A protein has these predicted regions:
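Subset of Sec-pathway N-terminal targeting signals
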Residues: 42-43, 48-89, 93-96
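Extended, charge-enriched "interface" segments that sit outside catalytic cores
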Residues: 85, 89-278, 295
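Active-site pocket-lining segments that scaffold enzyme catalytic pockets across diverse folds
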Residues: 256, 260-320
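Cofactor-binding active-site loop characterized by glycine-rich and histidine/acidic residues
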Residues: 296-459, 463
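Conserved thiamine diphosphate
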Residues: 350, 450-476, 518, 522-543
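Flexible glycine/proline-rich, aromatic-decorated loop/lid segments
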Residues: 425-428, 432, 440-459, 495-528
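Conserved phosphate-handling catalytic cores of large alpha/beta enzymes
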Residues: 438-447, 459-492, 497-501
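Hard-cation-handling environments
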Residues: 526-527, 537, 541-575
Length: 575
């Protein structure tokens, strides 16, 4: 009904009750125009009986309402007698509104038979869900601090514990571990998950052999990609039996060359790779995966540590030529520089594809070769008209002390995304043997938590990886190649390992680091650690692992190339 008001028993009542308006009309038509007060139930019941028999009741109600709505719109549109009746109704300051649109709305709603869901939110459940999301983010931000990264577990250069990674820190109890939460695909592409299962999965993902630092990356697409890449694997990359045997073969080569040189040329400087042997399968996996991504040319820059191993076991330098250099037999075409500064070029076969490899000559000054490599890559990209930066890849290798201590690193990173200097991203590898010459305590070598913290100045993600887990190392290599090719940005791999000998083979590290080296001397080699793992998994037998070592040693005795992927260079690709 329409909206004028009357006072009944001293209460304001709207005209929504037709009995009231009809009673008013009856009073008005009977000459009793006044405000009704004190309407008791006896009179009201009598009125009900009257309303049932009067012309104002029953089906005529709708007719009277329509008349009154017409009167509200245009008083002249109704009969003069009705106009006089409506004019005599009590006046009110409220604006009267027709009821027909309201009735039409409810009729339409009934026809549509629409049911709206009402969500009742439990404040306690909502608060718990917020804490679950905070728990997940704690692992994404700080899980790397509790990752199993140090092969010898000697010096806790990280914080000893991270309280945010404990569910109790977020006010959960042991009873909550069996509670299921709807996380709406926030992690692991799961809708519902028990808190206990979530805690276990997060620990496996972010606190295993890989510690990923990526939450400082501001670009959401890059951050989501990195996050998904690690979480989809639960930090447990899957490798085929053939791939595992190949990884062991490459570790055997890295270990075998160093042992051979140490026995054949004792005391000669070679800046051994021992302890960081996983560097060799890391580099070869980068080449293989880059080739699958369309890379045709890779330029490397590195210092002295592990360089001889890189020359023989990756680029395919003949061991015989290296032995001649140790013996002092220098070619007249050479510069006369030391053997661990020499450059090299070769072709590397990946299936039916070839990748041209170049190792830049290294000046003795640490890190100076990095901008040289970037310039060489940029010029090759220009020569190939490689405007998308897909065909030529830069890979630079650093030491843990040098990457944190040399100013040229910052200068090179600063130019990495500048339009005139960018090469579409560089893969930067740190051979982190946790010691700089004779200093291992990070409180004495740097002011940052990690040696790679400088990477954060350009928001480069950092993959910390345990050097005793070659499968994790290979996964890090693939991840780095894919990230670089997709986003054209720098990415760091922090290969955390150790140095089995002194800074060079003439040094005795027990004199300066007796505690550290008493542990290292008892620690098995990376080859031995992985061989035992594969034997336990049933991938190979102990006899096969030993045979692998013997075959490599025989190849060195013959002086032949030991890289099966080596190919004669295409003359058009020669440097």
């Amino acid at each position: 009904m329409c909206g004028f008001f009357v006072e009944v028993d001293h209460k304001i009542v709207t005209k929504c009750d037709l009995r009231i308006i009809s009673f008013f009309i009856l009073c008005i038509m009977g000459g009793q125009h006044h405000v009704i007060q004190g309407v008791d139930m006896q009179h009201y019941n009598a009125f009900d009986e009257w309303l049932a028999s009067t012309a104002l009741g029953g089906s005529n109600q709708s007719y009277i309402e329509e008349l009154y709505e017409s009167y509200l719109e245009d008083p002249s549109s109704v009969d003069e007698s009705w106009r006089a009746t409506f004019d005599a109704l009590p006046k009110t300051t409220a604006v009267e509104q027709p009821h027909s649109p309201v009735r039409d709305y409810f009729r339409r709603l009934a026809r549509e038979n629409t049911t709206e869901a009402v969500t009742v939110i439990d404040p306690e459940a909502s608060a718990k869900l917020v804490k679950v999301l905070q728990f997940i983010n704690a692992y994404r931000f700080r899980g790397h601090l509790e990752a199993k990264l140090d092969p010898i577990n000697y010096y806790r250069w990280k914080v000893s514990s991270v309280p945010e990674l404990d569910y109790r820190y977020h006010s959960f109890t042991e009873q909550d571990l069996n509670e299921t939460f709807n996380i709406n695909h926030y992690v692991y592409h799961r809708d519902n998950i028990k808190l206990g299962d979530l805690a276990e999965m997060l620990k496996e993902t972010y606190c295993g052999s890989i510690g990923l630092e990526f939450m400082h990356v501001q670009d959401m697409e890059q951050k989501s990609w990195l996050q998904s890449k690690l979480e989809s694997q639960l930090n447990k990359p899957l490798f085929t039996k053939e791939e595992k045997i190949n990884l062991l073969s490459e570790l055997t080569a890295a270990d075998g060359l160093e042992r051979y040189l140490g026995a054949k040329f004792p005391g000669a400087k070679r800046f051994s790779l021992e302890g960081s042997d996983a560097f060799i399968p890391l580099m070869k996996e980068i080449i293989r995966h880059a080739s699958k991504q369309g890379v045709q040319d890779v330029v490397f820059g590195m210092a002295h540590r592990g360089r001889l191993n890189m020359l023989v076991n990756v680029l395919g330098k003949k061991p015989e030529d290296l032995f001649d250099e140790f013996a002092g037999k220098h070619s007249g075409e050479r510069t006369g520089d030391v053997k661990y500064h020499q450059g090299f070029s070769s072709d590397f076969a990946v299936g039916d594809r070839r990748v041209h490899l170049t190792l830049a000559f290294n000046p003795s000054h640490l890190e100076i070769v990095s901008p040289v490599v970037i310039g060489a890559v940029r010029s090759r990209q220009t020569k190939k008209n490689d405007t998308e930066r897909n065909q030529v890849l830069a890979v630079t290798v650093h030491g843990d002390s040098a990457v944190a201590g040399q100013g040229v690193v910052q200068e090179t990173l600063n130019m990495s995304n500048a339009r005139g200097y960018t090469v579409g991203g560089t893969i930067r590898i740190v051979i982190n043997n946790q010691i700089g010459f004779t200093t291992s305590n990070p409180n004495d070598t740097r002011s940052t938590e990690y040696c790679t913290d400088i990477a954060k100045m350009i928001q480069a993600p950092i993959i910390h990886v345990n050097g005793d887990d070659p499968e994790a190392v290979a996964f890090a290599a693939r991840m780095a190649v894919e990230y670089r090719n997709l986003f054209k940005r720098d990415i760091f791999i922090d290969l955390i390992s150790y140095r089995r000998h002194g800074h060079n083979e003439a040094d005795e590290p027990l004199a300066t680091q007796p505690m550290m080296y008493s542990i290292i001397k008892k620690h098995p080699t990376p080859r031995k650690v992985y061989a035992d793992r594969l034997i336990a998994e049933g991938v190979i037998t102990e006899e096969e692992a030993i045979e692998m070592m013997n075959l490599y040693r025989d190849a060195l005795d013959n002086g032949d190339r030991v890289v099966k992927e080596w190919r004669e260079m295409d003359i058009a690709q020669m440097d």
